[in-house]
């Protein structure tokens, strides 16, 4: 199974809310992609960013490869994150968009990954919204098990 994590959102609403905060409490978050924002503190030592938690979760399971899809504005943020977190930089796909008005959408972003990395077309693909927070006890193996039980894809024996 391959995992594609979508982190291509342009965060317009969140960024405007952070920019309009006059207290200065959130200044360090200006421009930071939503998936790289701090997540709730974990008690088990997992990473503190939303994407870091997803990477830890899928990296410890039977996932062959993980890909990120991002936009041109946030690409450098994810490139730095990848370097610091042992994520293969070549698995970051830039959809080239620079604003919410030019965004491609999830289906087009998935198509972009499939065209850019044609070898994954032979694999089952799990798609994740990279800015979604999950509970500390979430176990992705349950998602994989459900997929197999429902025969989401014929298993090659």
What role is predicted for each listed range?
Residues 75-157:
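Conserved beta-loop-beta/alpha segment of the NTase-like Rossmann-fold superfamily
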Residues 1-77, 99-100:
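N-terminal glycine-rich phosphate-binding loop and ensuing alpha1 helix
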């Amino acid at each position: 199974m391959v995992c594609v994590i979508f982190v291509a959102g342009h965060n317009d609403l969140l960024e405007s809310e952070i920019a309009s905060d006059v207290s200065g409490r959130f200044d360090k978050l200006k421009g930071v992609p939503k998936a790289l924002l701090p997540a709730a503190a974990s008690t088990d030592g997992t990473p503190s960013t939303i994407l870091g938690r997803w990477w830890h979760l899928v990296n410890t399971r039977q996932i062959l490869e993980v890909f990120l899809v991002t936009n041109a504005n946030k690409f450098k943020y994810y490139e730095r994150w990848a370097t610091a977190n042992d994520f293969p930089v070549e698995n970051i796909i830039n959809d080239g968009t620079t604003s919410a008005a030019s965004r491609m959408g999830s289906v087009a972003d998935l198509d972009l990954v499939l065209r850019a990395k044609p070898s994954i077309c032979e694999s089952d693909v799990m798609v994740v919204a990279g800015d979604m927070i999950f509970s500390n006890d979430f176990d992705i193996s349950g998602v994989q098990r459900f997929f197999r039980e429902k025969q989401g894809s014929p298993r090659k024996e």
